């Protein structure tokens, strides 16, 4: 029996498409629905976490917010994969560059996600798990970014449990070739792996931690559309 609605998603089973494109900010999800979806229908507003289902170029797709941080995206993506029959989740969001080769507005396609989170402890694994994206989604995203002519890099991100921290150790992650910092990818990738489904994170560089270059909240909400173009091209 399908356990829907869930405590955090008010939709009935069947109201959410098999592919969901997610953003941390629910207003960004609303913007995606207005910009990319034909005939969008809202399926969720529980806790203000807006979700919509419609079509894009004739293909059914949903968009939804996931909030900030690993615990929040962990809850929403677990419910989507395990209770709503979702097969593919693509997160589009912002990240901070710790690479000399990435500027504000560039894309990061997260092939893997390093983390200081204990999210994997729930699985009681006899070692350290390496959260990675689905290869096919990752490959096609890189091909799409190339076709669009967008500046992008494919590689590892570091996903932190803390936004404000006493010592971020960004130099150490940079020395390991990590491209950028965000806060959600490992939970999404682990939930996808555990449920036998697919996931990908595509981020836009909102600030460069090395140079201090940054963007406004309004810019992050409304103007980071290149990553969305890539995400919707994967349908």
Specify the residue positions occupied by each region the protein language model found:
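Metabolite-binding pocket within alpha/beta catalytic cores that recognizes anionic/polar moieties
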Residues: 1-129, 135-139
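Generic non-transmembrane alpha-helical segments
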Residues: 140-148, 191, 230-234
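A C-terminal functional module that forms or caps the active site or interfaces directly
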Residues: 168-206
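Active-site rim beta-loop-alpha module in soluble metabolic enzymes
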Residues: 127-177
């Amino acid at each position: 029996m399908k356990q829907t609605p869930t405590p955090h998603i008010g939709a009935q089973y069947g109201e959410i498409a098999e592919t969901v494109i997610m953003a941390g900010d629910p207003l960004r999800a609303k913007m995606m629905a207005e910009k990319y979806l034909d005939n969008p229908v809202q399926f969720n507003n529980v806790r203000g976490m807006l979700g919509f289902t419609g079509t894009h170029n004739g293909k059914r797709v949903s968009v939804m917010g996931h909030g900030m941080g690993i615990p929040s995206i962990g809850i929403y993506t677990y419910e989507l994969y395990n209770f709503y029959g979702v097969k593919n989740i693509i997160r589009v969001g912002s990240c901070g560059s710790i690479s000399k080769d990435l500027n504000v507005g560039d894309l990061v396609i997260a092939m893997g996600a390093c983390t200081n989170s204990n999210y994997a402890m729930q699985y009681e694994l006899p070692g350290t798990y390496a959260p990675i994206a689905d290869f096919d989604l990752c490959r096609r995203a890189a091909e799409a970014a190339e076709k669009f002519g967008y500046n992008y890099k494919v590689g590892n991100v570091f996903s932190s449990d803390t936004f404000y921290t006493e010592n971020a150790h960004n130099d150490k992650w940079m020395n390991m070739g990590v491209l950028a910092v965000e806060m959600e990818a490992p939970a999404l990738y682990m939930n996808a792996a555990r449920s036998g489904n697919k996931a990908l994170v595509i981020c836009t560089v909102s600030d460069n931690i090395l140079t201090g270059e940054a963007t406004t909240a309004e810019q992050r909400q409304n103007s980071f559309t290149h990553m969305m173009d890539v995400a919707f091209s994967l349908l």
